[in-house]
């Protein structure tokens, strides 16, 4: 499949998926919120918690830092961060009230407090230079990601760190084809197991299509640099099926 250049990839993605992003995803996540984490664990053949640990191992923290978790979902990352450093002030932003309700209950059950914000993450309701650390995981395929990287850069303090993890497009064509075949099978099976709604079932092809015109680990590194980040580093896992990135906002404008 011939892909558009990085310069116009975001335009192609938005033209193809804007309706799904603005309307259909909310309905799907409303339905799957109670078993979102279990579904991911099943679909990943038990690797989901390992994926989370790989991501967490990249994140550097200091006591009492202010952290923003973008597309926080059920607060898996926020909770893991507080287990590591209980003095953190964590804000979780997500557009799904249902996912955040589950996440808030999980955090409170463990004795943690996470500040929940329900909003469209494309326009972060925070001032410039506000957070020491920002995380974004397993949601980039559903976002205008170049714009999102710029918005995250805006709310980061100079010298602050951004950490990203998501399913990405493998750079090896053979691995890519096998990956999509596996995803079709596992997404259908997981939907049956957890009795997903028609809205969730209808999005199975979208999840594949979104990956087919998404970015490889290497391309996402370039995109981060284009959005003004420095010290960009990346880790490709399972031949690039999963990618983790870390980047820093420069201390001063060049």
Residue ranges and their predicted role:
Residues 66-123:
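Class I SAM-dependent methyltransferase SAM/SAH-binding core
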Residues 228-254:
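Core SAM-dependent methyltransferase catalytic element
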Residues 23, 169-223, 233:
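C-terminal alpha-helical "lid/dimerization" subdomain adjacent to the S-adenosyl-L-methionine
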Residues 146-158:
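A short glycine-rich, Lys/Arg-flanked "PGG" loop and its adjoining helix->strand segment in the class I
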Residues 122-134:
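A short acidic, Gly/Pro-enriched loop at the edge of an enzyme's catalytic core
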Residues 133-146:
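A short SAM/SAH-binding and catalytic strip from SAM-dependent methyltransferases
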Residues 45-63:
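Conserved alpha-helix/loop element of class I SAM-dependent methyltransferases that forms part
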Residues 160-167:
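Conserved beta-strand signature within the Rossmann-like core of class I S-adenosyl-L-methionine
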């Amino acid at each position: 499949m011939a892909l558009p250049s990085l310069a116009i990839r975001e335009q192609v993605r938005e033209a193809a998926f804007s309706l799904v992003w603005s309307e259909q995803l909310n309905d799907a996540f409303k339905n799957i919120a109670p078993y979102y984490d279990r579904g991911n664990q099943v679909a990943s053949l038990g690797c989901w918690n390992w994926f989370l640990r790989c991501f967490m191992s990249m994140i550097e923290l200091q006591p009492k830092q202010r952290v923003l978790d973008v597309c926080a979902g059920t607060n898996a990352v926020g909770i893991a961060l507080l287990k590591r450093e209980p003095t953190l002030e964590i804000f979780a932003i997500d557009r799904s009230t249902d996912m955040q309700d589950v996440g808030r209950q999980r955090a409170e059950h463990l004795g943690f407090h996470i500040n929940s914000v329900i909003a469209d993450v494309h326009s972060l309701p925070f001032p410039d230079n506000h957070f020491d650390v920002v995380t974004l995981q397993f949601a980039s395929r559903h976002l205008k990601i170049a714009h999102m990287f710029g918005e995250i850069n805006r709310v980061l303090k100079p010298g602050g760190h951004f950490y990203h993890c998501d399913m990405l497009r493998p750079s090896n064509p053979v691995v890519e084809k096998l990956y999509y075949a596996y995803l079709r099978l596992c997404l259908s099976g997981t939907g049956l197991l957890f009795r997903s709604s028609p809205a969730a079932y209808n999005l199975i092809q979208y999840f594949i299509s979104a990956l087919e015109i998404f970015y490889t680990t290497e391309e996402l590194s370039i995109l981060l640099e284009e959005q003004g980040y420095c010290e960009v580093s990346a880790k490709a896992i399972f031949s690039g099926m999963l990618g983790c990135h870390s980047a820093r906002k420069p201390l001063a404008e060049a």
